[in-house]
Each structure stands twice: as C-alpha cells, then as structure tokens.
Amino acid sequence: MISSNDFRPGVSIEWNNGVWRVVEFLHVKPGKGSAFVRTKLKNVQNGNVVEQTFRAGEMVPQANLEKSLMQHTYKEGDQYVFMDMETYEEARLTAAQIGDRVKYLKEGMEASVIRWGEQVMEVELPNSVVLEVVQTDPGVKGDTATGGTKPAIVETGAQVMVPLFITVGERIKIDTRNDSYLGRE
C-alpha cells in the first residue's frame, strides 16, 4: 500500500481494476477543508489517461511490477516477440502496447519488459540506440557541425533530424526519449 502523499511521477498503483502510472500530481491544501492530491493517471494496459483526486493520506495498493531484460527476436504479423535469454520464455506485444517507441525497435535489441503478474504490460527501450541512416539528402561541401539540420530516415523507418554532414550509410546514436541525434557511432 502507498499513501497518496507519496505519489510521484512514475509510481504505479492498482486502481479501478487495472494498473495505473502517475503522470502528474499536485498536492492541494485549500484554506477551508481537508487537503487532497490531484493526479493525472495513465492506464498501463491501454494508454488511457484520466484525472483523479485522492484524499491526502488515502492508502492505495501499489502495483507490483516486475522488470526483466529480454531480446526482441522477430515480428510476427502485428505482434513483436521478445525472448528471455536465460529461460527462453517468450512474450508477445502489439505495436499499440509498445507505443511510439516501436519505431526504434530492431531485431536482436535488448529491452526491459514490464510484467504485472503473468501479464506483459509494456516495453522500455534503452535510452539511446545506434541505427544506420538509409535515406537523407546528400551533404554539400561547406556543411559544418554548427550548421542546421536535415531529416534522415534510419533502418527501422524512423525519421530523425541530423546535422548536415551526416550521409547515407553512417551509424548514428539516437536518444529514444526525445527523438534527438546524439552523435556518430
């Protein structure tokens, strides 16, 4: 059990027949009446976001989520198959469960799979990935590191803004949290 006073972004709770993650919270103490905690919660299973108010100090069951490192082995139809390299147990997730991070998912990549009991909830990709540029405008003599940026498409199909000097075939490091270019590899 966790007190509503201890809510922080990223805390997972069992509420309303599901697992919810706290996205935002605000502890409010009105001049008259008792304090309360206004939260924005995201359903881990389906991605729904709701706003909910809890009384200050209200006890809520904390979700017991297990995180395990698994490798993305292949894609079958609309499902992505992950395998635990120690137990050889498979987990299947849809693109909707993975979310917009699916654009950086590559076969052979290791990722953290989060489970609630036996049910697979979501995947956390590494903070950065190294991918090859497959399409971008050619570099022109005089392009510098301090110049502007141009769009580039990497091997997984994701589009990233890169410096002007990057060419097709180069391997670049990308931050998966904000889709930004970090450097050459």
Curated annotation (Swiss-Prot):
UniProt pathway: Protein biosynthesis; polypeptide chain elongation
A GO cellular-component term linked to this record: cytoplasm
One GO molecular-function entry: translation elongation factor activity
GO biological process per UniProt: peptide biosynthetic process
Keywords: Cytoplasm, Elongation factor, Protein biosynthesis
Localization annotation: Cytoplasm
CDD domains the record matches: S1_EF-P_repeat_1, S1_EF-P_repeat_2
Cytoplasm as UniProt keyword: yes
PROSITE patterns per UniProt: EFP
PANTHER family: ELONGATION FACTOR P, ELONGATION FACTOR P (EF-P) FAMILY PROTEIN
Family statement: Belongs to the elongation factor P family.
Record NCBIfam families: efp (TIGR00038), PRK00529.1 (NF001810)
Official protein name in the record: Elongation factor P
